[in-house]
Amino acid sequence: MSRRSTPKKRIIDSDPIYRSRLVTMLISHILKEGKKSLAQKIFYQAMKNIEEKTEKDPLKVLQQAVLNATPLVEVKARRLGGSTYQVPREVKAERGTALALRWLLSSARQRPGRNMVAKLTNEIVDAANETGNAIRKREETHRMAEANKAFSHYRF
């Protein structure tokens, strides 16, 4: 890998139905084995279910869920003199959103049941209401950063 220049950022197109980049990112995360049409079907059905369940705009519910699940700080391992420290650091907006989407999906996949649409619907609604595993994961990350605040002077 070349060390000369940083790679260019990928430009993410907005999806055709909701005109949102966030939706495109989530569909890409749902994607398994290149089956994008199946991922889109799962997501759009989940959005319909969210609308029926909450009687609110599903895009607003999704945005609120992602906002609630987005971490502000994280810990990163830093090796110094034979011991490894968990150093807290702020999370940039893009990485925070990506982490929130990843946590939402992994929490949805861990839920009991076979229907991914129902699992994703419930996880998004729970995250919008500040409950659920994705929110628990964010709080756990914040607790780790708080516990290791003493090492915050170690920079990268």
From Swiss-Prot:
Chief location category: plastid
UniProt entry keywords in alphabetical sequence: Chloroplast, Plastid, Ribonucleoprotein, Ribosomal protein, RNA-binding, rRNA-binding
InterPro entries registered for this protein in UniProt: Ribosomal_uS7 (IPR000235), Ribosomal_uS7_bac/org-type (IPR005717), Ribosomal_uS7_CS (IPR020606), Ribosomal_uS7_dom (IPR023798), Ribosomal_uS7_dom_sf (IPR036823)
Molecular function in Gene Ontology: rRNA binding; structural constituent of ribosome
Biological process per Gene Ontology, one example term: translation
GO cellular component: chloroplast; small ribosomal subunit
Pfam families: Ribosomal_S7 (PF00177)
Subcellular location: Plastid, Chloroplast
Lineage: superkingdom: Eukaryota
Annotated HAMAP family: Ribosomal_uS7_B
Subunit structure: Part of the 30S ribosomal subunit.
Function: One of the primary rRNA binding proteins, it binds directly to 16S rRNA where it nucleates assembly of the head domain of the 30S subunit.
Annotated family: Belongs to the universal ribosomal protein uS7 family.
Listed name of the protein: Small ribosomal subunit protein uS7c
Organism lineage string: Eukaryota, Viridiplantae, Streptophyta, Mesostigmatophyceae, Mesostigmatales
Gene name tied to this protein: rps7
